[in-house]
Structure formats: C-alpha cells, structure tokens
Amino acid sequence: MGNNPSALKRARQNLKRNLRNVSVKSELKTIEKRCMNLIREGKKEEALEFFKFVSKKLDTAARKRIIHRNKAARKKSNLSILLLR
C-alpha cells in the first residue's frame, strides 16, 4: 500500500467496493439457489415469476460490472433451460 494521500484513498475505496461486491455476489448465489429449489420442487408458476426477478438481478450486477456480462447470460440461460424442461 502506498503512502501518498491518493494511494490511501484508493485503498479505502477498494475496500468499500470489495465489501459491496461480495455482498451482491452472495445475494445472487442465494437467489439462484432459491430459483433452483423451486424448479426442482416442480413449482413452475412460482419458479417462472422468481426467474424474472433473478434475471433482473443478474442483469443489474452485470451492468454494474460486479459480474461479467457473459456470466450473467450463462446463468440466465442455464436457469431458463431447467425451467423449460
């Protein structure tokens, strides 16, 4: 870590952003698991509604560059394939 003021500020910013990103990624994992569980239980109607919510969250995270846009697309694709089975 640097000693000049700008380097110290960047370190503080990186710490804050890292905490926020970890929180969002954790939330994404949780809602993806909930969607998977709804699909496995055969609750298609609920799963479809929840899939829309998950899709929106993934797109938002990709737009804010918390996850890569291709990763968001891949996760949405995999969930939709499972949902349509």
Swiss-Prot record:
One Pfam assignment: Ribosomal_S20p
GO biological process annotation, one example: translation
Entry GO MF terms: small ribosomal subunit rRNA binding; structural constituent of ribosome
UniProtKB keywords: Ribonucleoprotein, Ribosomal protein, RNA-binding, rRNA-binding
One GO cellular component, as annotated: small ribosomal subunit
InterPro entries on file: Ribosomal_bS20 (IPR002583), Ribosomal_bS20_sf (IPR036510)
Biological role stated in the UniProt entry: Binds directly to 16S ribosomal RNA.
Similarity comment: family membership: Belongs to the bacterial ribosomal protein bS20 family.
Protein name: Small ribosomal subunit protein bS20
Taxonomic lineage: Bacteria, Pseudomonadati, Spirochaetota, Spirochaetia, Spirochaetales
Gene transcribed to yield this protein: rpsT
